[in-house]
Amino acid sequence: MMFDTADLMNAITTIQTITPPFIPSDAEVMTSIIEWPAGSAGAPPHRHPGGPSFGYVLEGEMLFELEGEAPRVIKVGEAFWEPGGDVIHYSDANNRSDIPLRFLVTMICAPGVPMLVVVDEDELEQRRDRRVPRQ
């Protein structure tokens, strides 16, 4: 039986198309599932210095905030991304107090560079003008 290419194309649903600012040569790629319990504040403010990250919400709702962007809710079946480099990721909190949050994230990183670096309070204060005020 011959495979019908149209069947393959009908099976694919594109949820996100991004042109990342950079992908390091000799990049390493890590795909992880992160699980936050109901009401969790998620990871502290951090960055991905070695490259961009791409994610997809599997369960629950994420309160997502990047430096320079207003916070937004990402729901099941929706995708998100971070440019990496110097941009601070302020929130990946569970937006719900009644159900857990599970999301998949694929991080691209230059060899020898940490996948994630927590941002300290002094730097957060120095860069507070880059954060979009919550409404």
Predicted regions and their residues:
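A short, N-terminal "cap"/entry segment at the start of jelly-roll beta-barrel domains
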Residues: 1-30, 71-73, 81, 117-135
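Short, well-ordered beta-strand segments in beta-rich or mixed alpha/beta enzyme
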Residues: 58, 76-79, 104-108
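A short beta-loop-beta micro-motif enriched in histidine and acidic residues
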Residues: 26-27, 39-57
